[in-house]
């Protein structure tokens, strides 16, 4: 049973947590050192057969939600564990620079409608916005410490990437692995088109 004295002293006790602030500039210095040393860049011919991670390129939206950070952190753990075993690791950083998300973003930011804007002008607006958003995303990726190959980044709107995906599609078609069928799709009435499941 508590005595009145203890109850009074308990009332007077006000615990305080002395806040220790983490200097995030320290993280930037460490990451810059890793970049300078080429820690995340694949060095062909060193360490044997490279370990390759096929990363899904995030949509270039400028912001990274916690789910994306969690997913890429899991990929990053695999990349780091393979490096710790002495393997050269190809962990490419890519950006999906196509799709409705980009078009909607540009329409809102530029206050224009895609259908009312000359095609090349709208493509230029998208390209400029994507470059800006990509820079923001790279900064976020670096802030969370992702160990991807930033020097070898790729874009889904680059000609070489499109040629590769088209050649792959044709090869799969020739093998009979591509088929056409009817299935339910997500449809956006506002955009007037189907949208991805993701």
What is the role of each PLM region?
Residues 2-198:
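N-terminal, positively charged nucleic-acid-binding surface of large information/translation enzymes
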């Amino acid at each position: 049973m508590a005595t009145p004295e203890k109850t009074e002293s308990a009332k007077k006790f006000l615990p305080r947590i002395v806040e220790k602030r983490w200097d995030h500039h320290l993280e930037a210095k460490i990451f810059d050192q890793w970049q300078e040393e080429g820690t995340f860049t694949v060095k062909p011919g060193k360490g044997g057969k490279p370990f390759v991670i096929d990363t899904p390129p995030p949509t270039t939206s400028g912001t990274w939600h916690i789910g994306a950070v969690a997913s890429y952190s899991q990929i990053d753990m695999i990349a780091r564990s393979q490096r710790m075993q002495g393997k050269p690791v190809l962990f490419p950083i890519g950006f999906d620079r196509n799709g409705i998300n980009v078009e909607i973003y540009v329409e809102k930011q530029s206050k224009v409608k895609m259908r009312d804007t000359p095609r090349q002008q709208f493509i230029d607006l998208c390209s400029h916005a994507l470059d800006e958003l990509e820079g923001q995303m790279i900064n976020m990726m670096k802030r969370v410490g992702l160990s991807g190959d930033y020097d070898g980044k790729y874009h889904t709107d680059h000609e070489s990437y499109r040629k590769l995906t088209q050649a792959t599609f044709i090869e799969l078609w020739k093998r009979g692995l591509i088929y056409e069928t009817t299935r339910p799709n997500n449809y956006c009435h506002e955009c007037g088109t189907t949208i991805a499941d993701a």
